[in-house]
Amino acid sequence: MTTDTLPVLAILGGTGDLGTGLARRWAQAGYRVIIGSRTADKAEAAVADLREVMAERGVAAVAVEAMENQAAAEAADIITLTVPFSHQASTLEQLKPALQGKILIDVTVPLVPPRVARVQLPEQGSAGQIAQEILGEEVAVVSAFQNVAAHHLQEGAGLDCDVLVCGNKKEARAEVIKLVEAAGMRGFHAGMINNAAAAEALTSVLITINKQYSCHAGIRITGLDHAE
């Protein structure tokens, strides 16, 4: 499968650790990836860094480019939002027209500093539900990747980590699971967007575990032997 037959991916807020980690993995898997940022300079710097990392890994060419968030959202088929919770709603309100008819992967975790190790879900239930309410039913919001350490994503090694994928449209969840697998992990249909609350809450639990045991913990789904 070539970049001509794969969906075009955009990562909004793609200059942070999580965004660059996903960009590296998807670009290496052969996807055309657009790194979006509020400023073109930051996006271009992230692209330059990604190309340098790919060269170090022996990957000769990758289809990656830099754009401001608006242009990135317009150009892509599937958009991933990796901005902090404090910027989620305003970013989605601004980009709502450009996202209509597309899949939005919402990676947002409603962390409230300084107590990020404490579960503090919003009144709406979850960040995923907030995204769906803002964008409307013409946008397939899919919640995923909340429980993956950015540190692991940026490395080139395999990932012993699973991803819970929540969204109201099964077909959209299936598309996101393909991207999870392209990034080197297992993805699981985890139900409607309301269930995103579970994955989002788990992040604070994992932060607590990471601090306690000096690790980068993830989650693993067990008991699947009978299905293989």
PLM regions with names:
Residues 5-8, 101, 160:
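Phosphate-coordination loops involved in phosphoryl transfer and adenosine-cofactor binding
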Residues 57-103, 110-115:
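Rossmann-like NAD(P)-binding element
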Residues 11-12, 81, 165:
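Hydrophobic Val/Ile/Leu positions in short beta-strands of Rossmann-like dinucleotide-binding domains
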Residues 162-228:
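Active-site-lining helix/loop region of Rossmann-like oxidoreductase modules
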Residues 2-52:
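NAD(P)+-binding Rossmann beta1-loop-alpha1 motif at the extreme N-terminus of oxidoreductases
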Residues 108-155:
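Rossmann-fold NAD(P)-binding glycine/threonine-rich loop
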